[in-house]
């Protein structure tokens, strides 16, 4: 009999096997072709992949609960139809595709820990940005409720990626601006068109060096700080303070991590993701970020916890 602690350890160090099966199935388009029951041979022929390998992959997907098998035919489990099929409004396939990039970067972790420098082995910009859209679309309503948009006429989604938060607020009547790098702004404009939202202002630039505009009632920095050093984040907050109207707010949204930087596990592991993918990034505790807002002159600072993230809110 395997001791419980050893079974737990095995689950941890072999966790990559389930992950790789999901990533490969997503990359190959398996889930999009299993909305209706099909045989392994049919799927292999349609996707031009090896029949034997396809059958083994489908059996593994069945074993981990993402596919159902019966009478020699396979179809998506409910969870796969909901999140891994492109025509679902809850589609998460882009962020799963981005996880394939993370896989490559994490594979360089030995080297990164030895040298202390990131070693990006691959990066798909569009899947990363659209992956952010996959995640953010699930959180926009809870964010708006937590903030309360009364009196907010203008907002800036700084480093806004796909512009998901700005789009959601524009739908509520807020004059919204998205600021990000030029290649990212192109994607955000496409997302806005797909959502049928007009009137959003898009500014392309580098927020570390370029003007971000002014006259905002609210500036949102959602999932920005973890990519940079404390010094860079403080400088960014100073820039935000000059761009916010008197009485306006800055809102930082991040993954929460405790003061010892060890929990929750997702955040501690996400810091490793920043280690392998950025020069100076990691997760920061709410207390650290609150201290930065105090240092840069914001007042009435509040910390609010949402289901997956934490907000640090300060007033000018």
PLM feature segments, named:
Residues 1-63, 68-69, 149, 162-316:
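Alpha-helical subdomain
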Residues 8-16, 20-33, 38, 46, ...:
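Conserved Class I S-adenosyl-L-methionine-dependent methyltransferase catalytic core
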Residues 151-161:
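Conserved class I S-adenosyl-L-methionine
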């Amino acid at each position: 009999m395997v001791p419980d602690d050893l079974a737990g350890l095995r689950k941890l160090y072999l966790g990559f096997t389930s992950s790789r099966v999901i990533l490969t199935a997503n990359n190959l388009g398996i889930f999009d072709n299993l909305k209706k029951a099909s045989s392994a041979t049919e799927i292999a022929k349609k996707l031009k992949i090896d029949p034997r390998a396809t059958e083994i992959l489908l059996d593994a997907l069945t074993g981990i609960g993402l596919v159902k098998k019966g009478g020699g035919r396979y179809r998506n489990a409910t969870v796969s139809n909901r999140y891994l099929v492109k025509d679902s409004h809850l589609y998460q396939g882009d962020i799963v595709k981005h996880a394939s990039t993370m896989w490559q970067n994490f594979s360089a972790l030995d080297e990164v820990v030895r040298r202390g420098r990131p070693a990006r082995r691959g990066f798909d910009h569009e899947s990363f940005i659209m992956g952010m859209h996959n995640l953010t679309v699930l959180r926009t309503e809870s964010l708006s409720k937590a903030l309360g948009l009364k009196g907010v006429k203008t907002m800036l989604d700084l480093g806004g990626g796909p512009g998901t938060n700005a789009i959601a607020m524009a739908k509520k009547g807020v004059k919204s601006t998205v600021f990000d790098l030029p290649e990212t702004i192109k994607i955000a404009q496409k997302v806005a068109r797909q959502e049928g939202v007009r009137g959003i202002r898009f500014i392309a630039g580098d927020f570390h060096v370029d003007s971000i505009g002014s006259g905002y009632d609210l500036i949102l920095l959602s999932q920005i700080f973890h990519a940079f050093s404390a010094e860079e984040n403080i400088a960014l907050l100073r820039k935000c303070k000059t761009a916010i109207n008197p009485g306006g707010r800055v809102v930082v949204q991040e993954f929460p991590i405790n003061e010892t930087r060890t929990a929750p596990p997702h955040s501690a592991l996400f810091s490793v993701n920043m280690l392998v993918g950025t020069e100076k990034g990691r997760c920061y505790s709410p207390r650290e970020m609150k201290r930065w807002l105090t240092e840069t002159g914001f007042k009435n600072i509040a910390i609010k916890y949402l289901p997956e993230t934490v907000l640090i809110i300060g007033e000018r």
